[in-house]
Amino acid sequence: MVRLDRGYVEVSGADAEDFLERMVSNEVASLERGEARSALLLTAKGRIISPLRVVRTEADSFVLVTDTSALAEPTAASLRAARFAAKCEIDPRAWEGFVQLGSEPEPIAFPTNDYGVEAWESWREAPAEGADPQELEPLRIEAGTPAWGKELDDSILPAEAGLDRTHISFTKGCFPGQEPIARLRHRGHVNRRLRRIEVPAAQPGDEIVWNDKVVGRVTSAVEGHALGYVRSEVPDDGVVTVGGSQARMRPA
């Protein structure tokens, strides 16, 4: 079991489901108890406030799992600012996050694809022992999973990180940021995209060079693998140079 630096916001009450359905980018109403779904909390301009996993814990209670513990308070504050007359409580929780590689470990646990292997994420209300989360970095990077503070921040468009494929429903009702997200989808592409890079060695900040032109920078790296945002015209299997070494692109 590996500890995670996650944040938790509990949203509960008679209007919790309807409120979250109007606030986040993916469908909430169809969630069963114990089921989780990836979503985003966005600004009106379609920028990311917080990547989320929305977990239904009871009929009228949900837990929003944020990428880092530092995102819990901003997430709660953004939701409270939009609550108005909705009958729901919005409370950050000081819980401990964990991921178990392999079998399901807890009564409420949800599967995660963040590490490219079978894994289940859960939380506990009291501290418990677990391995250091840095042990998961090679798996995360090789799987092409973006992390807040590395590949994700409030300047990134969801489509640049590939989150439009996993965190957004284009058929649900309105939510903040829906219009710019839909316009970008109609346009057909973004100018840069997150890619996996097969490279002997790299460091965050290294330039990614293609046809003698800087087309991106490395955001995360471990031995043999890296992530970075690269101009969209570079082919998914293109050969680039990173830190003086030849490297090959892969889609994230």
Model-derived regions, located:
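Short, conserved charged micro-motifs
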Residues: 15-20, 71-76, 105-106, 125-129, ...
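Acidic, low-complexity central loop/insert segments
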Residues: 1-3, 7-10, 53-147, 210
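Glycine-centered loop/turn motifs
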Residues: 33-36, 77, 108-111, 144, ...
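Glycine-rich, small/acidic residue-mixed loop/short-helix segments
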Residues: 48, 52, 156, 161-168, ...
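Anionic-ligand-binding alpha/beta catalytic cores of soluble enzymes and soluble regulatory domains
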Residues: 120-193
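Short, intrinsically disordered, mixed-charge
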Residues: 21-29, 77-85, 186, 210-213
